[in-house]
């Protein structure tokens, strides 16, 4: 009958690639049972991510240990950016608490579980695991990198959501004043955030002839057309000699408007095909869509004058009238909730009372009476 398997030797050997890794060499009286169990003892303070969006210290948090052990391995700056979650199951030597036993080769969770008296020396736990959360950036350089999309790899979601929230508004206001044609600035404007529209309204009031102001007008109409009208008014008021402003701010008398109709339908500065809509107020833009332009060519082969009268024949009626520009759209107006007035409620109450009065009268039972014979002499 063979002798029992006994443990004769325990030796701790350091790892080679990582100083945190160690080997526990177990020597038995039968060499075939010898094992080298690899484990780790964490000693680093993390200031980097072990993988994108997470930090996983080599520490096994066993029952009875405070979670503060996990947070002690990350720098204070990261402590504000990451949250601790339930990590993967792990095993740790009780006589070296926090050590992380690697599962590899023959050493598996099942192998440890099947070892006799293993629970006397090995405890189960969960590995420390941190994941990144949304947080407010504390320094201007980080805000600049995230909001200008220079480097968004480590940006929290609230600073990397295509400008859907207000977190980048302050930075983009200053950034876009210096570079209004920047694609990121135009993307911020397309999100239709009011700080963006207000910023571009101020910029275009000085530089309405810039190309990005055409995009600005296209974006804000029809719902926020006042931002564009304000910019056009200020620009044209400061540049009255600019021919582009002659439709919005015509320097001559209004006699043409009186006899020929709205100048957006006949004035060259308004009707030319090359005209950009940004040079029209919103109401002029709407008006121009209602103008009908009729163009024709008249060829006169002969002209006969009789008593200062001339008769010309043209084929203008054969052409189809072309409607002007596409309508810029109607702004969304929220209807106010109409509450019933006291007068209406009082009238309704009186009518209901009268109806109930007549119903009560006609619903009463008829009183039985005796017939009385009256004789007249």
Swiss-Prot record:
Disulfide linkage: none
Pfam families assigned: Pox_G9-A16 (PF03003)
Induction entry: Expressed in the late phase of the viral replicative cycle.
Domain of life: Viruses
Intravirion side: 363-377
Post-translational modification: Most cysteines are linked by disulfide bonds. They are created by the viral disulfide bond formation pathway, a poxvirus-specific redox pathway that operates on the cytoplasmic side of the MV membranes.
Keywords: Disulfide bond, Fusion of virus membrane with host membrane, Late protein, Lipoprotein, Membrane, Myristate, Signal-anchor, Transmembrane, Transmembrane helix, Viral envelope protein, Viral penetration into host cytoplasm, Virion, Virus entry into host cell
Any one Gene Ontology cellular component term annotated for this protein: viral envelope
UniProt record, GO biological process: membrane fusion involved in viral entry into host cell; symbiont entry into host cell
Major location category of this protein: virion
Virion surface side of membrane: 2-341
Residue intervals passing through the bilayer: 342-362
Family annotation (InterPro entries): Pox_virus_G9/A16
Entry membrane topology: Single-pass type II membrane protein
Localization, UniProt: Virion membrane
Residues with lipid group (N-myristoyl glycine): 2
Family of the protein in this entry: Belongs to the poxviridae A16/G9/J5 family.
Function: Envelope protein part of the entry-fusion complex responsible for the virus membrane fusion with host cell membrane during virus entry. Also plays a role in cell-cell fusion (syncytium formation).
Subunit structure: Part of a stable entry-fusion complex (EFC) which is at least composed of proteins A16, A21, A28, G3, G9, H2, J5, and L5. Formation of the viral membrane is necessary for the assembly of the complex. Interacts with G9.
Protein name: Virion membrane protein A16
Originating species: Vaccinia virus (strain Ankara)
Lineage of origin: Viruses, Varidnaviria, Bamfordvirae, Nucleocytoviricota, Pokkesviricetes
């Amino acid at each position: 009958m063979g002798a029992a398997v006994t443990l004769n030797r325990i030796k701790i050997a350091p790892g080679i690639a990582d100083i945190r890794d160690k080997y526990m060499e177990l020597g038995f009286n039968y060499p075939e049972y010898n094992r080298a169990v690899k484990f780790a003892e964490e000693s680093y303070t993390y200031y980097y991510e072990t993988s994108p969006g997470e930090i996983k210290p080599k520490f096994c948090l066993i029952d009875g240990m405070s979670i503060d052990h996990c947070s002690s391995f990350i720098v204070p700056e990261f402590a504000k950016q990451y949250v601790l979650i339930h990590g993967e199951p792990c095993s740790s030597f009780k006589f070296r608490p926090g050590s992380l036993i690697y599962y590899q080769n023959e050493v598996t969770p099942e192998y440890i579980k099947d070892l006799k008296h293993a629970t006397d020396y090995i405890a189960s736990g969960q590995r420390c695991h941190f994941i990144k959360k949304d947080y407010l950036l504390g320094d201007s350089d980080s805000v600049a990198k995230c909001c200008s999309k220079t480097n968004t790899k480590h940006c929290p979601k609230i600073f990397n959501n295509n400008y859907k929230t207000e977190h980048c508004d302050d930075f983009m206001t200053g950034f876009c004043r210096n570079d209004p044609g920047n694609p990121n600035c135009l993307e911020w404007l397309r999100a239709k955030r009011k700080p963006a529209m207000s910023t571009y309204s101020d910029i275009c009031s000085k530089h309405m002839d810039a190309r990005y102001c055409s995009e600005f007008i296209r974006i804000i109409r029809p719902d926020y057309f006042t931002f564009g009208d304000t910019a056009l008014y200020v620009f044209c008021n400061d540049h009255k000699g600019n021919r582009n402003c002659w439709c919005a701010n015509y320097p001559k008398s209004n006699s043409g408007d009186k006899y020929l109709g709205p100048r957006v339908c006949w004035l060259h500065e308004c009707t030319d095909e090359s005209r950009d809509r940004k040079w029209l107020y919103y109401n002029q833009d709407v008006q121009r869509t209602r103008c009908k332009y009729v163009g024709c060519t008249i060829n006169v082969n002969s002209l006969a004058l009789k008593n200062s009268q001339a008769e010309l024949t043209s084929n203008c009626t054969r052409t189809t009238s072309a409607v002007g520009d596409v309508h810029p759209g109607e702004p969304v107006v929220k209807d106010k909730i109409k509450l019933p007035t006291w007068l209406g409620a009082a009238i309704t109450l009186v009518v209901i009372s009268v109806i109930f009065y007549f119903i009560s009268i006609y619903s009463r039972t008829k009183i039985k009476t005796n017939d009385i014979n009256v004789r007249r002499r």
